[in-house]
Amino acid sequence: MWVMSQVRSMEPDLTLAAVYQAAANLTEQDKEIFSEAVKTAFSVCSSAAPSARLRMIETPTQNFMFVTSVIPSGVPSGEKKTKLNIDAALDNLALSFANKKSKKMARTYLLQNVSRTQDQQVAISGTYILYTKKHIETSLMLDKTKLVKQILEYAETPNLLGYTDVRDLECLLWLVFCGPKSFCQSDSCFGYSKTGYNAAFPNLLPPYLYECGQNNGLFFGIVQAYVFSWYSDFDFSALEISERARRRIRSLLYDLKQKFSEQEISVLPVASQMCIFCALYKQNKLSLEYVSGDLKTSVFSPIIIKDCLCVQTTISTTQMLPGTKSSAIFPVYDLRKLLSALVISEGSVRFDI
């Protein structure tokens, strides 16, 4: 796993573990940005992989890294086992960044890691979150039985269960995909106005959680963080479920509280309890405020829908980055067209976009 964050005004340094020495030369504003970046990166790593050991190193390209899982979990049969020299590997990694690469002269449109645009009126963006049509259709399905079964079938390995340290994976997946807080918490959710639906849409989760066959440790680490964030203080006494199900939920939450009690969970409960339409509505508002000049500083990771024809092209939402021929994209989506393209039938959801 690699978590990287750019810090302005930090001179490149080819030595490892020199981050804190270099930070001494930063301005007060940059120190705050640097400190927040380190805390956020560490929180994300700890949430996704609570049992992993992290190593923080610096690269000459004005970045820092948290490195973990550098040793493979197993060696395929028939291959010769070799002893890894981790220190040498990290040294080679750092030196590899020293080779300067030629910059493209043609204009490119950045889809990740936009750092800043103007002096004070800046829009700081993290990695763009790319959703496919399949991701969105899966997120809006009320019956996620097929998805949960696929995940459970893929997850039935002893090393995974030992890694996640969760005794009831089925209960964990039920809470994140079907539980009482798995639906949009906005009072004006777009689902209430959708003809034939008239209810809150399911929450939008990271696209990673709608796929099977990925890194299982990371997958269940993220799911645990969401469940803990949503349900750690939730009262299940009024919920109409069987007593056996209630006991399973209490047991699961007890395990998660033991694991996360002293850790900061990076999943923000408010931001993570919105459907795709409410999330895009807030994104549209933020992008328009930026274009109008009312936005001073904002940190967000814009959603990009792959091959979507519902982007509002009559509004300028790009910004040339100073000193480059690249542009930052701040998309605005036509929500009326998106809602009209949503076709809901019994047991299925289809997006005609």
From Swiss-Prot:
InterPro entries: Herpes_UL95. Pfam families: Herpes_UL95. It comes from the Viruses. Belongs to the herpesviridae UL95 family. This is Protein U67. The lineage of its organism: Viruses, Duplodnaviria, Heunggongvirae, Peploviricota, Herviviricetes.
